[in-house]
From Swiss-Prot:
EC number: 7.1.1.-
Cofactor: [4Fe-4S] cluster
Natural source organism: Campylobacter jejuni (strain RM1221)
GO molecular function, one term: iron ion binding
InterPro entries recorded: NADH_UbQ_OxRdtase-like_20kDa, NADH_UQ_OxRdtase_20Kd_su
Membrane topology: Peripheral membrane protein
Similarity-based family: Belongs to the complex I 20 kDa subunit family.
Enzyme class label: translocase
Gene Ontology cellular component annotations, sorted alphabetically: plasma membrane; respiratory chain complex I
Entries under Pfam families matching the protein: Oxidored_q6
One record GO biological process: electron transport coupled proton transport
Name of the protein described by the UniProt record: NADH-quinone oxidoreductase subunit B
SUPFAM superfamilies: HydA/Nqo6-like
Amino acid sequence: MAEHQINYASGLPVVLTSVDKLVQWGRSNSLWALSYGLACCAIEMMAAGGSRYDFDRFGTIFRASPRHSEVMIIAGTLCKKHAEFTRRLYDQMPDPKWVISMGSCANTGGMFNTYSTVQGVDRIIPVDIYVPGCAPRPESFQFALMILQKKIRKEKASRKIAPKRLV
């Protein structure tokens, strides 16, 4: 049996931080994304989830339910008939929530400047990160996720608990 000696002369190992930083670190490193692929950009989003780019190492896991997601990734052309459904999905996501608009069609409507196309997802829901390109490479999407992680780490953790009314 091996004997281990611990030298406490230099003090105990202590980590000093705040609760806000700890919560934001946890949030930024465990992003559960709602993969909302509407057109060709969804192919690049699926490639980003594969073994070559391995988004799991960043803590990003794709989910099918908005109730289990914190990040909504809109990739592709959004039609006006589909806009109400998109808003409903966004409203079903728990707070805090973030949105990434991926590709030219999601950002500005792309080449589809018609009456039936929403000319930018930000007209329907608030967007945090825009990824340009047609279709953007997985590296661009990866960079956008890293920017979102930095943004989350800088935000203040909300601890507001609304009192429940009994009457």
